[in-house]
Amino acid sequence: MKLHDISAYQTSAEHFFERLQAWDVDLVLDVRLHNTNQLAGFTKERDLDYFVREIEHATYVHDPEFSPKPDDLSAYLHKTMSWEDYAAAYERDLEARGAVADFFKKYGSYHSVAIVGTATDKRKSHAEVLVKV
């Protein structure tokens, strides 16, 4: 299985879908905590589900099991938690909940998975951590 992280932010639809096509993804796994507001643009949950099916002919799943804890995300976004502490807390949480094993049970049959996160020019995303664990 190949894992890729991709940001839903600061990207055009063209660039987003070109990357998915280059990776030949068969699953787009959305692990964002909040993916329904207008700021998400073309990557809002319902829109992204449609576009992934119609453009990429892949499966789209929003799975909050792999989202960060709301308090940790808030602390990171408000700069009261460093990236290193946030990434470590997220990894500990995944391990404590057995989420890594769940990931492979749920998605182990896919050959190329794009994990949707929220990285920007100014911040990293928990999707980057999930790809590595």
Identify the residue ranges that each predicted region occupies.
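Residues lining hydrophobic/aromatic ligand-binding pockets adjacent to catalytic sites
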Residues: 1-133
